[in-house]
Amino acid sequence: MSSKDSAHDESDREASKYFNPAFMVLGYLGLIPFAMALLVIFSGKYEFGYLSSEYIVVDPQVFFVTYSVAILSFLAGTLWQQQFFSSHGCEKNLVLSNAVVVTAWVGLVATLVSKAWIQIAVTTNMLGFLVLLARERKAMVLDLTYRKMRHRLTFLVALMHLLMLVFMLPLSR
C-alpha cells in the first residue's frame, strides 16, 4: 500500500467520526412514502386523494414504484461517490449502479405502459436495494452507526416491497 493509499484510508476513517445525525432522520423519514402507499392499499381505497375524483388521483402502486426508483437512484449515487472519494471505489461500482437504476427505470416505464408489469417492477426494485447494499457492504468505510442504519433501512424497504407484492396477489383483495 502506498503512502497515498494509507493517507486516503485515514481520511476515510476520519470522515466517519463525524456521522451527521441528519442521515438517520432523513433515512427513516424516507420510509414514510412507502408506508403511505401500503396503508392506502391495505385500506382498500387503491387511490390517494381526499378530493373528488375530478382532481388528480394517484395510484398507490405506481406511486410506490416511482418513489422506489427515486430512492434507488440516490443509493446508486453512493457507489459513484466511492469511486471518487474512497480507496474502495472501482469501475464495477459504476457499472452496477447504472445497471440497477436503468433496470428500475425500464420497469417503471413498462409499468406506465401497462400495469401488468408492476409486480416485476416491484420485484426488480426490491432486488436492486439488496444488490446495492451487498455491493456497498464490500466497500463500506463509514462508521458502525451508519452501517446499522443502512442495514435496517434496507431490510425495512425490502419488507415493504414484499408486502406490496402480497397486496397485489388476487387473494389479498
Predicted feature descriptions by range:
Residues 88-98, 123, 146-155:
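Cytoplasmic-side transmembrane-helix entry/capping segments in multi-pass membrane proteins
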Residues 2-83:
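Selected alpha-helical membrane-embedding segments in polytopic membrane proteins
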Residues 86-87, 109-117, 140-144:
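Membrane-interface helix caps and helix-loop-helix hairpins in membrane proteins
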Residues 136-173:
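Terminal transmembrane helical module of multi-pass membrane proteins
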Residues 79-108:
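Helix-adjacent hinge/juxtasegments
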Residues 108-131:
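Transmembrane helix-loop-helix
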Residues 3, 126-142:
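Transmembrane alpha-helical segments of integral membrane proteins
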Residues 35-42, 104-112, 158-173:
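Hydrophobic alpha-helical transmembrane segments in multi-pass integral membrane proteins
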